[in-house]
A protein has these predicted regions:
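N-terminal "arm"/small-domain region of PLP-dependent enzymes with the aminotransferase-like
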Residues: 1-74
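Short beta-strands and strand-loop turn motifs
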Residues: 62-64, 179-185, 213
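Active-site phosphate/pyrophosphate- and oxyanion-stabilizing loops and adjacent acidic/basic residues
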Residues: 81, 199, 203
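Conserved N-terminal alpha-helix of the aminotransferase class I/II PLP-enzyme fold
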Residues: 52-101, 110
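Conserved beta-loop-alpha segment that forms the PLP phosphate-binding cup at the N-terminus of a helix
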Residues: 92-118, 122, 127-137
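PLP-dependent aminotransferase-class I/II
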Residues: 128-200
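A short helix->loop->beta-strand "cap" motif at the edges of active sites that frequently abuts
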Residues: 205-212
Length: 213
């Protein structure tokens, strides 16, 4: 008996009917190419991380404990250099003190925006948790962007979920410093934005205001 038939018989002995086995095996066969693509992406990313670790000379010394003050903290500096290389960024901030996505976005927005600047969202409302950070609630917590003189402008998507390019163009002003694009739909009924659609939106905005972040 070949391996395939032996496997099928083993499932039958376990109470799985031949019809169920054939159905599941057929799905697995049809998904084989897709799983192979996923494995290739995983392998590519693994090589990318390994090369970044080699470039930044990750060693056992990077895992030594530090005083807690950050003096000569080789491990932390090396980890951030690895992240920057992997994501092709100028630099990276990788700290356990950043506890969630809203926390990370708050740090980024606060670092890049200054009084008089404007933040633009061309895809409608951001996450509820960001409203307090931006300052769009009726009662905002201390330290919101609004409190520091940073304005906010928003352009909603069209009813069919597409970008309102005309209104986005009109919303880009001289003091528009940063554009935030939320890919996830969050709690809104709109579809999640694909990478391709986000790229299209970024290209459009950059063609109008190249210096915007």
């Amino acid at each position: 008996m070949d391996t395939m038939n032996l496997l099928k018989k083993s499932y039958m002995d376990a109470g799985i009917s031949p019809e169920v086995y054939d159905y599941c095996h057929g799905i697995s066969s049809r998904m084989k190419d897709r799983f192979a693509q996923i494995d290739q992406v995983a392998e590519l990313n693994q090589i990318k991380v390994l090369r970044a670790m080699q470039k930044n000379r990750v060693s056992a010394a990077c895992f030594e404990s530090s005083t807690g003050y950050g003096y000569d903290d080789l491990g932390r500096e090396t980890l951030e250099a690895v992240y920057a290389d992997v994501f092709r960024a100028e630099s990276a901030l990788v700290r356990p003190q950043l506890t969630c996505g809203t926390h990370a976005l708050t740090v980024a927005l606060s670092a890049m925006l200054r009084p008089g600047d404007e933040l633009l969202s061309p895809v409608g409302r951001p996450y509820d948790t960001l409203e307090g950070v931006i300052g769009t609630r009726e009662v905002n917590p201390p330290g919101s962007l609004k409190e520091f003189g940073i304005s906010y402008r928003q352009v909603d998507l069209l009813p069919d979920g597409s970008f309102d390019f005309e209104r986005i163009k009109a919303a880009l002003r001289d003091n528009t410093k940063l554009v935030t694009i939320q890919r996830s739909k969050g709690y809104d009924p709109r579809p999640t934005l694909s990478v391709e659609r986000i790229g299209e939106l970024i290209a459009f905005i950059k063609s109008i205001k190249p210096d915007v972040i």
